[in-house]
Amino acid sequence: MNSKVALLVVGLAVVLALVIGRQGPVAPQATNTQSQAVAAGPVAAPVAFPQPLYPQAANVAMPVEPDPAAGGGTAPATESPLPNFVPRKLKVFEGHWQGMDGRLMTEELARKLNYPRGLQGVLLGEVTLNAAFSGLLAGDLIVRIDDTPVTDMESFKAASRTVANRSDARISVLRKDNRPGAPVVRKLTVVLREAEGGLGFAQLEGAPMILAGDPRPHGYRGACTDCHPIGQGFELTPDPDLISLPPPTITRDMVARSVNPHEVRGPCEACHVIK
C-alpha cells in the first residue's frame, strides 16, 4: 500500500515538472509587461507640436474674444492680437475733384497702357459729373490747371486750390490716339465749370488697407507699408456692390401670365419662390 502511494506521488511530480518545463517560469506581471515592450521595440514619447497662436480664421488686426467655455470656464492665456499698423507717412494713391478720379502717371502705367515714356501728370481713370460734362475722358492726362503745371498728385491738389473759389477753370490734358502703332498724344484744353459754390479743390487718398500677409497683386513698388496700412477695419466688408439680394417672391398668376420684369433668364422657379 505504501509503495503504491509513493509511486503516485512520484508520478504527479513528474507531470508537474513536464508542465512547468513547457510553459516556462511564471514571471511577475511587471516583468512580463516590460519584456513585451522590449519585444515590440522602443516606444517614442509623444511629441508636443506648438499650436498656432491665432486660429486661421481670426484676423490678427482685430481683438479675439476668449472662449469662456474652453478649459472649464477659464480662458487660455495668449498674447494680445496685433493692432492695426498705420504708418505716419503714406504715399498718395489717388485724387478726386469735380468728378475726376485720377492717379499719378508712372512708368509702369505708361508701359501697361501704351503711353509715350517720360510723361508726367495725373491720369484720369474715370470721369463723372462736371468732369464728364466738360468733355474730359478716361485716359486723359492732366498736365496743367490754368497756368499751374501738374506733375504729381501734390501739385494737382495745389493747382486746384488756386481755382477753388472760381466757377470755371481751364484744364489742359494730353489725350492718346487709340490708332494702332506708336502711341501719339495730342494736347487740348477743356473748361471745367461749377455753377454754384465754386470748384473747390482736389482731395487726395492713400492706397487701401490690406491684411497682414496678403499676396501682392501688382509688381514690386517698394515696401507694402510705404502705401498701405496693415490690418482690418478701414474698409467696409463685405463690399455691398458684390452682394446679390435674392429675387422677390412672385405669384402663380404672374407666372401663368408670363409677367416678366426682366428679360427671359429661364424658368421662374429657378430663381423665385412662387406662391
Swiss-Prot record:
Motif position, MCR (magnetochrome) 1: 210-230
KW Transmembrane helix (keyword) present: yes
Phenotypic consequence of gene deletion: Cells have a weak magnetic response and make magnetosome membranes. Has fewer but larger magnetite crystals. Makes small, flaky magnetite crystals, does not alter subcellular localization of MamC, MamF, MamI or MmsF. Deletion of genes mamH to mamV (amb0961 to amb0978) gives cells with no magnetosomes and no magnetic response.
Membrane spanning stretches: 7-20
Subcellular location as annotated: Cell inner membrane
Region of interest: PDZ: 89-206
Inducing or repressing factors: Constitutively expressed, levels are high for 24 hours after innoculation then decrease in stationary phase (up to 144 hours) (at protein level). Part of the probable 18 gene mamAB operon.
Lumenal side of membrane: 21-275
Top-tier EC class: oxidoreductase
Chain positions of motif MCR 2: 250-274
GO cellular component: plasma membrane
Cofactor binding note of this UniProt entry: Binds 2 heme groups via the 2 magnetochrome (MCR) motifs.
Cofactor(s) the protein needs: heme
Entry GO MF terms: metal ion binding; oxidoreductase activity
Domain comment as written in the entry: The dimer forms a pocket of about 8 X 15 Angstroms, lined with acidic residues, which may bind 2 Fe(2+) ions.
Quaternary data: Homodimer.
Listed name of the protein: Multi-heme protein MamP
Organism in which the protein naturally occurs: Paramagnetospirillum magneticum (strain ATCC 700264 / AMB-1)
